[in-house]
């Protein structure tokens, strides 16, 4: 693991636009040299644990580029060496020196250490028990989330559950995948028992982790790791409970990424962004979302500073069914409606397509580095599709129709007979298809592919021409720099 300075005397606090609990200067800090005593101290510490979610190493770039590995899109961008580390990953020719893999390894680590700090310090504090429970619940949720990212990308990783008092405390061997998932599940169960529901939060705290967020995360963990009847039943129970807590689908699919409607009725957990000027993108101080900037059509003038990354492939676009309104709300294609009277040209892209769903107008985001557009990590449509999948895998295929239809109906696919009377295998294929289209470019497709049964990931990748992909590529390599810093780290098979 990267040698990092431990959190001891000062805890940096990230505060983000869109939720008051994070809407302050990024350099507020907690001086623990005089003791860790007040609610403000505890809240500042847990706020700091959210910060790495914002970074380019995670949701501001690397997580969504996993869709490129998954074959939904190509890098695009400026060509040449622009994004070559992502190109190498997507073409399955990367090695252990790959910079994108290094980012993904390093991204969650500071968050884990900050959660450990909270979990060590807060239990002994003499503060209101409800607030204490909520703060501990947030830390448990976030630690589980960071480890869930790591274990799906790399397999076993060092299991750090205490604050690091020296660099040597970080030089741990890799724990087993089973050990990592045991911690993830335990942490999420703690989070569920401690966190408030979203309806119990004041507006000033909107955007914090909630009971529902932890429940949805646990359902996803079960879908990934266990895949047995007992846990599929638990997934259905969790998803039903979330549905009873007031969540519903947005009427307009496009509203999910409208900054004016963030943390809405469909949203379960979002990475909060604070549109801040004069911050370097690669700096950990950056608080602005670059999602619209990265994915908008390059040189089109449609929005501020578009780079043209993550260009949808023709194979992906062909998967849209006739009448699916998500097509024109997800991608730009020749002849599609745009905004501000502009016309889309396939010349803006090497594939002939660009991602539309995240693009902000110049009115919404007049400067490329001032966007407060959140990243939606978990939303209710995902919960409905997990429920449908779990029901089908239990052999309850007819019951899987209703949650699947609810998602498809919002997309304009109102012919329910198209999903009725299917075999379990046919329904499985429908749900896989629906997850791909509904959650396109949101960072889920790669994680879905590697959890599907029957060698799905490699068969799909080979079918679209990514023939260099092999079983070793289902995990990323442990980065060379990390193994040089920590000789206890072993490499993944084949790398």
Give short role names for the model-derived ranges:
Residues 20-82, 181, 189-192, 200, ...:
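An aromatic- and glycine-enriched ligand-binding surface/loop that stacks and positions planar moieties
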Residues 84, 88-93, 316-380:
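Flexible, polar/acidic helix-loop-strand segments at domain edges
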Residues 18-21, 39, 50, 58, ...:
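Long, intrinsically disordered, low-complexity segments
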